[in-house]
């Protein structure tokens, strides 16, 4: 039986990583904004059940906490989607963090967590989109497997950093996506370097891995290298991402190049760029 295709959505992509702390969600938010600014109709879904934070990165206020753990059952499918996505900076977005309080704990593990995420994803009124980007939880277990075995994905971007440990964990993710038949579009190297504030030359601040096999030997294309800069972290902390506040910066240009590569890989035809959202 084939996996479920979400009506009205041309391409469903996943942003994934083998471990946490590589900046996967930062990449997902700014990539989505770069695609939107190229005229692509984009939705963004936070699939991290236990640590959802896309809504905070977009500056969307969280719900008040109940102060109690939430044991949420997976209900029967609704007759039709009914959850309206929130729009911010031109993106349609939904996060499980918008459905519970900002400090509430969700008591759902294993396949149950995966089914809950799939159910929420299908219940959102997405409308017509060129791309829906899912920000996956880190790792290679559940709920990732349930998501990949339920929803049809057109490709995945693997987010890593230059160090050995990150690349080793990336190789484990490769096995998961190969097993489930999801095409790997390529690798995004985050925190790759920084630009010297005096001369503008790139400086590699982390020891580069000697195990580039995770990218080269496996024949995966490196789709982009994202530099370090305080404006990236500041934008995420304040809910005003870099691509919105400083769209012409060198760091934003790296995301624009990444967006162009993703569009090329999946055959997107960007439309007329939108007016900038205030």
Regions found by a protein language model. Give the residues of each.
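Residue-level signature of catalytic and energy-coupling elements of molecular machines
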Residues: 9, 20, 46, 54, ...
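C-terminal boundary of histidine-terminating zinc-finger modules
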Residues: 238-249
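Walker A/P-loop phosphate-binding motif and the immediately C-terminal alpha-helix
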Residues: 11-49, 174
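Conserved catalytic-core segment of NTP-binding enzymes
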Residues: 130-235
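Phosphate-binding loop that captures ATP/GTP phosphates
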Residues: 41-103, 114
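Phosphate-binding/switch loop-helix module in NTP-utilizing enzymes
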Residues: 97-150
């Amino acid at each position: 039986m084939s996996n479920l295709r979400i009506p009205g959505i041309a391409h469903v992509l996943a942003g994934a990583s083998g471990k946490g702390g590589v900046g996967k969600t930062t990449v997902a938010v700014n990539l989505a904004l770069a695609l939107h600014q190229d005229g692509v109709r984009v939705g963004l879904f936070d699939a991290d059940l236990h640590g959802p934070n896309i809504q905070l990165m977009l500056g969307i206020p969280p719900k008040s906490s109940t102060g109690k753990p939430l044991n949420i059952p997976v209900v029967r499918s609704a007759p039709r989607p009914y959850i309206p996505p929130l729009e911010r900076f031109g993106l349609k977005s939904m996060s499980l963090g918008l459905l519970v309080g900002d400090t509430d704990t969700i008591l759902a593990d294993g396949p149950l967590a995966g089914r809950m995420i799939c159910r929420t994803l299908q219940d959102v009124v997405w409308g017509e989109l060129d791309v829906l980007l899912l920000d996956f939880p880190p790792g290679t277990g559940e709920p990732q497997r349930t998501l990949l075995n339920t929803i049809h994905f057109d490709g995945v971007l693997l987010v890593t950093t230059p160090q050995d440990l990150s690349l080793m964990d990336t190789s484990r993710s490769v096995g998961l996506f190969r097993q489930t038949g999801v095409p790997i579009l390529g690798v995004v190297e985050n925190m790759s370097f920084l630009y010297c504030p005096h001369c503008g030359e790139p400086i590699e601040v982390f020891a580069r891995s000697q195990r580039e096999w995770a990218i080269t030997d496996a024949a995966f294309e490196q789709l982009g290298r994202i530099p370090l800069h305080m404006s990236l972290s500041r934008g995420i902390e304040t809910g005003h991402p870099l691509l919105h506040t400083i769209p012409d910066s060198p760091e934003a240009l790296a995301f624009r190049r990444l967006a162009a590569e993703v569009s090329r890989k999946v055959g997107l035809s960007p439309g007329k760029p939108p007016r900038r959202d205030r």
